[in-house]
Regions:
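Short glycine/proline/serine/threonine-rich loop/turn segments at secondary-structure transition edges
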Residues: 70-75, 152-160
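Short, surface-exposed ligand- or partner-binding patches at beta-edge/loop junctions that are enriched
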Residues: 80, 157-167
Length: 196
């Protein structure tokens, strides 16, 4: 007699549309722009200029993990971010640009909401950050990045989401990804989690 697996591996695919837990942070060295944009079609990890001053962009986004039982074991978690085909920032041609656009994906370690701005932005966990190397390709999607450790911490602890930022925020460098507001639903941020 074959005994069925009482605890089979399950897969959850999350690709939210119009995610309210998502924002691009902006900072300029004059302090004139230090807020967060919650409706932008892009998630930025960038260092550029605007009006002759330095502009730095960072992205924050959170997936709803409530469907995963708190006592579940995370087998794997893969994050995909897709380069925007129609950039609204940077040189408005290349989604990836610069001589050093290497970036970090980090687990956010404190809560944030619509009062978010640059001065009160939550920190990312640098001890577990994931390093993404530089690319010379104008369009380069990040497919199935292993975020198992980060996601496990979100399920077993607090889920404050992910942060993306350049490793060196020096202009002109850019990584520009589609947000959950992008018209192409297939290019919105995606997280695929296997658990049991």
């Amino acid at each position: 007699r074959v005994i069925p697996n009482q605890n089979p591996i399950q897969t959850l695919t999350l690709q939210h549309g119009n995610n309210t837990n998502e924002a691009t942070l902006a900072w300029t060295n004059s302090g004139t722009k230090t807020g967060a944009n919650f409706i932008l079609q892009e998630l930025l990890a960038s260092a550029w200029t605007t009006g002759g001053e330095l502009f730095v962009g960072r992205g924050l986004f959170k997936f709803d993990l409530s469907a995963i039982p708190a006592n579940a074991t995370i087998i794997s978690a893969r994050l995909s971010l897709y380069s925007t085909p129609n950039p609204l920032n940077g040189n408005q041609v290349d989604a990836n640009f610069g001589t050093n656009n290497s970036m970090f994906i980090e687990r956010v370690v404190s809560n944030w909401n619509t009062t978010l701005n640059w001065p009160n932005q939550p920190l990312g966990d640098i001890a577990t950050q994931i390093s993404i190397p530089h690319t010379n390709q104008s369009t380069f999607d990040l497919i199935d990045v292993d975020v198992t450790g980060l996601t496990t911490s979100m399920v077993t602890g607090n889920n404050y989401g992910f942060k993306i930022r350049l490793q060196n925020e020096v202009f002109y460098n850019l990584r520009n990804f589609c947000s959950s507001k992008h018209a192409n639903t297939a290019k919105r941020p995606k997280l695929v989690i296997s658990y049991q």
